Amino acid sequence: MDKSISLRMMFCNVICTFLVILRHSLNLRAFFISETPANWNAIVQNGSMNITSIAVPFFFLMSGFFFFKGVDATYKDTINKIKRRCKTLLVPFLVWGAINTIILQVSDSCRYGLWDGLLFTHLWYVRDLLFFVLFTPFLAFLRNKATFILYLVLIALAILWQPVDSVFPSSEGMFFFTLGCTLRQNVLLRITCHSSMVFLVMLWLIIPFVYPIGQTIVWQKVYIFSGVLLLWILSQKMPQDINRLIKTVAPYCFFIYCAHLYVLKAIKVTLASMFRNNDAISLACFFLIPIIVTVLLLGIGVFLKKHCHTTFALLTGFRNLQYLKKNESTIL
């Protein structure tokens, strides 16, 4: 695979991992129990939810692309890749599902069932990805023998796509995973950054704070799809310093993604109970807690990899070794 594509995917992987954490940092209900405010704090946090909505679609897109790596694959190659995905996805899905179940049962066993920690937490992304991988032999056949039908399937999935959909199976996940499986390396390489893109990026960032995107599904789809495209375009202009930082953080993205939710929630709920109905603290926590959680879990990940390698391998589905060898994204 072209090294520039792998490097750009790493950049997008790190950005999207942080966006997921930022999305879960929404704290209006935690700080304001009786009535959610309708002020600048709410506008910033709710508007930011639209920006973060590109993260999971990009994860699915990236996972689909890396399955075929932009080239045609034989039936045998596809089956072998499914077996490898079962190792890198099913193992951490079960391990983290067990951890989530224990946390939920200890915190509130009356509210949560035994299966909730496995099926209905932020691991829904991994759950759906495992399901979508089963359809890759069919997608491989269409890629190789019936491209026109594959395009028709994509159009149908785009129509059926419900934005920010985590219900099994996710229509959003299916569309972007199939799109990723369809993309070829030469197409991604042709999407380059021009000076005019700066204006489009600024416009894209401002829109959700002045226009209620979520009221119309069509506009929501356009906003998410254009955001995914703009993120890929911007990835071409990484400074060298950012490039080095990305290479350091990327091997731990999957661990951070799986581990962040309850760490973030504990910090958020604790601070909310101490500073109830405080807009300034609420907004500060919204932006600062994701940074704190990311740095904290990055440190824990580095420690586990160095001193508890087997544990870290189980928590990440042994994908870290694959990453070091192939320089691929670790969210797959």
What does each of the following model-derived ranges do?
Residues 1-332:
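Alpha-helical transmembrane segments and their immediate juxtamembrane cytosolic regions
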